[in-house]
Amino acid sequence: DVHGEEVLPHNFIAGFEGIPNLRSEQVQMVELFKQRLLELNPDFQTSQGYPPAKPGHANLGIATPFMAESFGAVAMTLEMPFKDSADSPHPAEGWSPARSRMLGRSCLNALRPLVDRMRGED
């Protein structure tokens, strides 16, 4: 899922921490994705974002934790700033459609190792 973040001026992943049946494989896949995205895109970071839910306290009314809990999925929400990224600001243009496209491309490239791993090709 992809959202625009109104408050936090960062690109980050909101995950499914706190779901009742959290599996280590799910966590490993999300961490692999985030690490790969860090390598691929200077606008992505992992130090800022929403605090993770405590174990067993995920809000299952939100799509990401619902999908992870209900289907064992590796679900994520990519949050992007509406105005600009504080981590790599561009004062003249702010957060732009071009930067969004570049981040989207990076996300697809970061997903490749996950797909390979799920297929047993890693």
Question: Could you describe each region identified by the protein language model?
Answer:
Residues 1-122:
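Structured catalytic-domain cores with a bias toward divalent-metal coordination
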